[in-house]
Amino acid sequence: MRQRHLGQAGGEVSAIGLGCMGMSEFYGASDEGESLRTLARAVELGVSLFDTADTYGFGHNENLLGRFLAEGGAARRAGMRISTKFGIVREAGRYERRIDNSPEYVRAACEASLRRLGLEQIDLYFCHRRNPEVPLEDVIGAMAELVAAGKALFSDSSLSTN
């Protein structure tokens, strides 16, 4: 598997990552055992970048990835880079969603993701969607605080045009 350099402190990461969203919802029924086997096979093939979000499966996706990390111990964690996202808030049983980028939500979402993933630090923490009503400086400031506190190694934005 080809590798890419991930920033000055991020080491190497596989050029191909595995998006885990479908392991929890959106593309039909999911099977936890099959999902765990898929994650294991991806690692065997040299994939080291795994992408999830707090909204996928209402937290189930992060819990699944956290279980996989825990079952593999420190050696597995050392070889994986975890990317997760915040900002899309959904209620169970409803299709509607809202976007929350408030600094309070950014911090709370990060803590919840760390807990579900069983991590002390998220490698890549993304703002999933932007709410233009929240000043960009506030969003970036909250994310920078998480990096400074060691809760995220890197932060950025996903699918934002404003």
Walk through the language-model features, giving the residues of each.
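Active-site beta-loop-alpha junctions enriched in small/polar residues
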Residues: 21-23, 53-55, 85-89, 127-130, ...
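N-terminal binding-site loop/beta-alpha segment at the start of enzyme catalytic domains
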Residues: 1-80, 148
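Generic beta-strand or strand-like secondary-structure segments
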Residues: 64-68, 81, 85, 105-112, ...
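N-terminal small/glycine-rich loop or linker at the start of catalytic domains
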Residues: 8-26, 83-97, 121, 126
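Proline-centered loop/turn at the N-terminus of a beta-strand
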Residues: 79-81, 153-154
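Glycine/proline-rich, positively charged
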Residues: 93-162
